[in-house]
């Protein structure tokens, strides 16, 4: 089947779907599935905008609300994970995944689903070592700390994913697995993004948690975004046992959705022709969710996952045949993901802006139904009970030094904290942190939300997106992608990209939809939303 992969979406749903439509007209057939690697920005209304970790003047409604309201419908089944610029209050309603709009499905904090027999997993957020061992304690209204910590990856999600034993076909993460740059054209990457050099040389660029998952899961494909550059790599894994076939992972990171940027790629993925063409739950993953329900922590206290160190009665939560049988019986042997989307919040109305809309910590009926079927407790229900008991959400958020559960280990598993680039990125505009702090929503006051008007010309294909490349039928990492190569005029590899039939797609001329001419030097395209993703907090790793 034909699968499209998008990098950082940044709310540009219309542009992405329009680009897909153009690619379909030029290509061999329709796209069956769209995968988005974070910064999706499922913003329904003005309150959601205030929960996105960017300065107020760079918050824009974009066009997702039209898909949420039913005014528009996604033309292709769309799956996405969360990044570090999201409507966090919206995604928090769906910790185990769910529909954010008809035909648009969020994978949750971490999740695994199946589509046409293809097993797709993902983890939302970015890595930060000081939040990694905390629970999911954040809830609206967020403060200056929780508006950022809510999208930081937690060890419980990594732990659950590491219980998987069956092969994964595709895995999504927002930030890159650490060290993946050593398996691709590193020289080309550093010529394109020279400010990565220090992190690459120190081997601190990317997420160590994602790297741990890559080593454990060994998926056929791994897609990421976050660093705003296209990069391919081929990682050959070592076989654990003699006689066992060594597996390999094809890694691809994509750019953000801007004109003349490599933000979209189409691949041919092998699938099971006899498998249903609707989204299915994954039985192994559901069994793991059920088994690990008692491990959920909704405080900010540090918490170590069970391990075989003599301190835990149980440390293996992988799915058993008996456990999977029980889950199947609970679901009446029906693994189809129900199309049970419902509107849970007021939708943005351009004619009636509501800049003082109240923030509410909602319980989503999709999550309630899912938890009832599986026999687990909604994280948000636990949070609300905790809030009632302590009169404040996230009471323990500053207690990083609290003794962790049943473990003598006080230090984080990882001694670095650089999921994203810590160098200054000249591709972005640095924003004043003091201004950023002013953006945080107070629990006791409403805040005006500037710039909530939708994007201009939302229904038209922008001329600035006219430089659309013919997309390859499949991703094959050629030898030129994993060795040093010359750089062309836009800092892109001089190597080849092959289609499924071996054709060199770099030789296909670029086709344009307007009379504009390609300049000798790359234009600086100033768009209303391109600067918002440069917001750097005091730890310098939430920039991308």
Curated annotation (Swiss-Prot):
Pfam families: DBR1, Metallophos. Residues 413-425, 445-463 have a biased composition (Polar residues). CDD domains: MPP_Dbr1_N. Its EC number is 3.1.4.-. A divalent metal cation 2 binds at residues 39, 84, 174, 226. Ubiquitously expressed, strongest expression in the spinal cord and brainstem. It is found in: Nucleus. Residues 512-522 have a biased composition (Basic and acidic residues). Its cofactor is Fe(2+); Zn(2+); Mn(2+). Optimum pH is 7.0. Active in presence of diverse metals including Fe(2+), Zn(2+), Mn(2+). Also activated by Ca(2+). Binds two metal cations in two adjacent alpha and beta metal-binding pockets. Residues 395-412, 429-439 have a biased composition (Acidic residues). Keywords: Acetylation, Disease variant, Hydrolase, Ichthyosis, Iron, Manganese, Metal-binding, mRNA processing, Nucleus, Phosphoprotein, Zinc. One of its GO terms (biological process) is RNA fragment catabolic process. The modification Phosphoserine is found at residues 464, 474, 478-479, 485, 499, 514. PANTHER family: LARIAT DEBRANCHING ENZYME, RNA LARIAT DEBRANCHING ENZYME. It is linked to Encephalitis, acute, infection (viral)-induced, 11: An autosomal recessive disorder characterized by increased susceptibility to viral encephalitis affecting the brainstem and induced by neurotropic viruses, such as herpes simplex virus-1, influenza B virus or norovirus. Xerosis and growth failure with immune and pulmonary dysfunction syndrome: An autosomal recessive disorder characterized by premature birth, severe intrauterine growth deficiency, congenital ichthyosis-like features such as collodion membrane, severe skin peeling and xerosis, and death before the first year of life. Patients also exhibit bronchopulmonary disease, thrombocytopenia, and neutropenia. Additional variable features include cardiac anomalies, seizures, encephalopathy, cholestasis, and cataract. This is Lariat debranching enzyme.
């Amino acid at each position: 089947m034909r699968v499209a992969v998008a990098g950082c979406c940044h709310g540009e749903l219309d542009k992405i779907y329009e680009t897909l439509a153009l690619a379909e007209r030029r290509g061999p057939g329709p796209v069956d599935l769209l995968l988005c690697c974070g910064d999706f920005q499922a913003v329904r209304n003005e309150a959601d905008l205030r929960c996105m970790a960017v300065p107020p003047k760079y918050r824009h409604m974009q066009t997702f609300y039209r898909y949420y309201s039913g005014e528009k419908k996604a033309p292709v089944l769309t799956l996405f994970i969360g990044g570090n610029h999201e409507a966090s209050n919206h995604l928090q309603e769906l910790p185990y995944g769910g529909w954010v709009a008809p035909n648009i499905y969020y994978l949750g904090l971490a999740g695994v689903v199946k589509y046409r027999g293809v097993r797709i997993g993902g983890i939302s957020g970015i890595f930060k070592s000081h939040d990694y061992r905390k629970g999911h304690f954040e809830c609206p209204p967020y403060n200056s700390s929780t508006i950022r910590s809510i999208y930081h990856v937690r060890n419980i999600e990594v732990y659950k994913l590491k219980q998987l034993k069956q092969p994964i076909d595709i895995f999504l993460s927002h930030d890159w697995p650490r060290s993946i740059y050593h398996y691709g054209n590193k020289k080309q990457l550093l010529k394109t993004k020279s400010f990565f050099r220090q992190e690459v040389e120190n081997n601190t660029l990317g997420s160590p948690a994602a790297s741990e998952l890559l080593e454990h899961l060994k998926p056929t494909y791994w897609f990421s975004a976050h660093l705003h550059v296209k990069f391919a790599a081929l990682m050959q894994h070592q076989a654990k046992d003699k006689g066992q076939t060594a597996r390999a992972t094809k890694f691809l990171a994509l750019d953000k959705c801007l004109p003349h940027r490599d933000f979209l790629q189409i691949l041919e993925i092998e699938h099971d022709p006899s498998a249903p063409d609707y989204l299915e739950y994954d039985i192994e993953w559901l069994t793991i969710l059920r088994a690990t329900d008692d491990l959920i922590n909704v405080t900010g206290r540090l918490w170590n996952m069970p391990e075989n160190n003599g301190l835990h009665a149980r440390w293996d939560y992988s799915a058993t045949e008996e456990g999977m049988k029980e889950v199947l019986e609970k679901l009446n042997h029906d693994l189809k993901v129900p199309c049970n989307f419902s509107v849970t919040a007021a939708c943005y109305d351009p004619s009636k802006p509501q800049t003082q809309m109240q923030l509410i910590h909602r319980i989503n009926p999709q999550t309630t139904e899912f938890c009832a079927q599986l026999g687990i407790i909604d994280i948000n229900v636990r949070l609300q009970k905790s809030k009632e008991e302590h009169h404040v959400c996230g009471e323990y958020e500053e207690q990083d030094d609290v003794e962790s559960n049943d473990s003598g280990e006080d230090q984080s598993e990882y001694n670095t904290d650089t999921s994203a680039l810590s160098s200054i990125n000249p591709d972005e505009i640095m924003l004043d942190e003091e201004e950023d702090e002013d953006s945080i929503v107070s629990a006791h006051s409403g805040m005006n939300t500037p710039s909530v008007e939708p994007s201009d010309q939302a229904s038209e294909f922008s001329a600035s997106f006219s430089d659309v490349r013919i997309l390859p039928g499949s991703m094959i990492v050629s030898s030129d992608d994993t060795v040093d190569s010359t750089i062309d005029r836009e800092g892109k590899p001089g190597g080849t990209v092959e289609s499924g039939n071996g054709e060199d797609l770099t030789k296909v001329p670029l086709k344009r939809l307007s009379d504009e001419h390609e300049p000798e030097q790359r234009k600086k395209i100033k768009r209303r939303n391109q600067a918002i993703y440069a917001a750097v907090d005091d730890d310098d790793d939430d920039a991308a």
